[in-house]
């Protein structure tokens, strides 16, 4: 990350959010602070991805902010393209997964159905296959941080705050280490705030029950 950033911009800061890990993430990250422009934020417990993202965003100060997962599957070569689109006037440039052939058919079906439900019942367009990997202007970050929601569905909020957006298709690289712990349970837990906050489905269900 440091090498890519130095090639593209004159000044930057890296913020690592340790979302209540039990391994050596915090210790090893802190050890790098003397060598790199790095800050490490350690949460008191595992709050989940959405809250970890917001905790990091609230501590940024730059004119532009990039969100990047720690699994290193998203090629940093796309940062240059994102910056070019920002120079064209786009205030948020986000990555979209080009294909999902490495996933099971059940997970692909669940994801497709989930986004279909979201977009049928929502006034805000929520792109399917969009990643959290994105470059955002300071105004976008400030707008997200000003929202009062505690249980957040970030992919919905990215679209809800508005601004000019641009999608960039990417191919994911293999995970650098380990295996993903984000399975169906994580998808379901993440999806509930999305369905309840960004669609009319809960109202329709309760209306149907009342009838």
Where are these regions (language model features)?
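A conserved acidic beta->alpha catalytic loop
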Residues: 18-27, 72-73
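Short aromatic/hydrophobic "clamp" motif used to bind/position activated sugar donors
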Residues: 65
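Alpha-helical bilayer-embedded segments of polytopic membrane proteins, i.e.
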Residues: 192-211
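Short helix-capping segments at alpha-helix termini
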Residues: 5-10, 33-37
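Catalytic metal- and UDP-sugar-binding loop of GT-A-like glycosyltransferases, i.e.
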Residues: 43, 68-70
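Acceptor/aglycone-binding surface of glycosyltransferases and processive sugar-polymer synthases
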Residues: 41-45, 49-59, 76-157, 173-192
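Short beta-strand/loop segment that forms part of the nucleotide-sugar
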Residues: 2, 10-21, 41-43
């Amino acid at each position: 990350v440091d090498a890519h950033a130095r090639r593209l911009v004159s000044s930057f800061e890296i913020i690592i959010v340790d979302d209540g890990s039990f391994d050596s993430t915090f210790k090893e990250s802190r050890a790098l602070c003397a060598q790199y422009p790095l800050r490490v934020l350690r949460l008191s417990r595992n709050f989940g991805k959405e809250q970890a993202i917001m905790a990091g965003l609230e501590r940024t100060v730059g004119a532009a902010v990039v969100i990047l997962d720690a699994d290193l599957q998203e090629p940093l070569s796309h940062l240059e393209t994102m910056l070019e689109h920002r120079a064209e006037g786009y205030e948020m440039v986000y990555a979209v997964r080009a294909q999902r052939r490495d996933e099971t058919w059940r997970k692909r079906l669940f994801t497709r159905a989930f986004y279909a439900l979201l977009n049928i019942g929502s006034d805000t367009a929520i792109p399917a296959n969009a990643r959290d990997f994105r470059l955002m202007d300071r105004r976008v970050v400030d707008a997200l941080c000003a929202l009062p929601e505690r249980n957040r569905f970030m992919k919905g909020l990215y679209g809800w705050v508005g601004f000019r957006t641009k999608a960039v298709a990417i191919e994911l690289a293999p995970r650098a280490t380990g295996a993903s712990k984000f399975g169906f349970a994580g998808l379901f837990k993440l999806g509930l705030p999305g369905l309840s906050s960004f669609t009319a489905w809960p109202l329709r269900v309760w209306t149907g029950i009342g009838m």
